[in-house]
Structures are given as C-alpha cells and as structure tokens.
Amino acid sequence: MSEQSSKYIAALLAVLSISMVLGIDLFIFSLQSEKQTMPHLGVGVLVAQLISLLVFYRGEICPGQRGRLIKVNMTFAIYWAVWLLISLLQNNHTLTNVMSVCGLSVVYFIWKQPKTEKIRNSFLLMAALIAGLGCLSYLMIFTELPASDFAEYNPFAPILSGVILANLVLVIARNRLQGFIALLPLAMIILLALNALAMFLFLLLNGMESAVNSESVFAYIIYFVCHFVIAAILILHSFQKWTLSTNSLFILLFIAVCLPLWMVFV
C-alpha cells in the first residue's frame, strides 16, 4: 500500500470513528422526550483528547507520528462544531456552549502546537487545562440533573468510550508507544467494572421501580450483556497477548457509545 493511500485510509477511519460517536449521540438526543442539550458522550471525547495531549506531552514520538496524531485529532472538531451549533440554537445552555468551545479550543491548540519543545509543552499544558474546564462543565451539568437520570448520564460509560476512542486514534495514527497503548485495555476493564458497579448500585438503591415493565427489563438486559461482550473481547485479547486491532476497537467503541442509548428506554 502506498504512503498516499495509507494517509487517505487513516483520514477516512478517523472521520468514521468520530462520526459514529456523533451519530449515536445525536440519535440519543433525538429520542429524548424532554430535550436536555447535553452531549451524552462529550466527556468521553474530552477524555480522548486529554489522553492524546498526554501522548504529545510525555510520549517520545517522532515528527511523523506527531503529525499523524495531530491530523487524526483534528477530526474531533466535527463533533464539537455540531454540538456547539445545536446548543446555540437552544436557550439557556451556557455550560454546553462552554464545553463545546473547550473541545474546539483543544483541537486548535493541538493543531497549532509549536515545534520548539519548551513552548510546545506550555501550549499543551494550556490545552489540558481547557479540556479540564470542559470536563468541569460536564460535571456541573450532571450535578443539576435529577437522580432518576443517573442511568442515562452515568459518566463512567462515556469515559470508557473516551479511552477506547483514544486507543483507536493512536492505532489509526500508527503510534509506536506500545507500552502506553498496552495500558489502555487495563483502564477499559477498570472503567467497565466501575460502570457496572455504579449501575448495579443505582438499580439497588433507586431504580428498581424503573425496571417493572418489559421494555425497561429488556433495556437493562442488553445494557449488562454489552458489558460481558466488552469484557470478553478485552480478556480474550489479554490472554492471547493480542493487540487491539482497528476492527476490534471499532466494535468496542460502537458497543460502548451505545450504552447510554439503552438507558433512554428505561
């Protein structure tokens, strides 16, 4: 495969991955009876950007790897631009605006990072602070939601999606930090367990009354089956000492970003 063809395929995969996240997020938004202009998966995209910033800041990567990772990260602008537009068309959604602007700002800082290491590191630290502000905006919106909405907006699920997305981004960009990439599946397993535990406690303490009809029971069954599927894929790759391929990561990402979708039906 020629270098030019490889670049086109990488660009296509990058656009496809963020488009899948955006498409499912917008589908969830369209299903809501009471429109809450808050991206369910926004904090996950911010987490993916933060992991990319960590690679830029601490990773010993060559200019070629840096350039490829910058190009892949630029596709995140699609997600944030769409959500900023949606938020601006609604009323009284300032925190979502802030979150979207923070996401776009991180894309800009990554794109324009200087070549001089000292200045570049300052640039990247500023971008990390902005991403942190975006996560804080998400947290502020989350704390204003009623307790009954926890299942749908549970932050562990989108954070899990963000780690998977970051892994996919690094693979698409052909990053060679194999030691760091090998740690990401472990983070996925931990987040998957935390998400399952949080949902189990929610059901135990607050949500049993929501699981009385067949539609809710079916949604919860699919939700937890998805956990087993993700865990099975990760454990199989771990036992066989396989690295997560692009195809495997796309499957994992699709399952993970659909987790909040099932909770809309509860």
Swiss-Prot record:
GO cellular component: plasma membrane
Transmembrane segments: 9-29, 37-57, 69-89, 123-143, 153-173, 184-204, 216-236, 246-266
Superkingdom assignment: Bacteria
Protein topology in the membrane: Multi-pass membrane protein
Protein localization: Cell membrane
The keyword Transmembrane appears for this protein: yes
Main subcellular localisation: membrane
Keywords: Cell membrane, Membrane, Transmembrane, Transmembrane helix
Protein name: Uncharacterized protein HI_1241
Organism: Haemophilus influenzae (strain ATCC 51907 / DSM 11121 / KW20 / Rd)
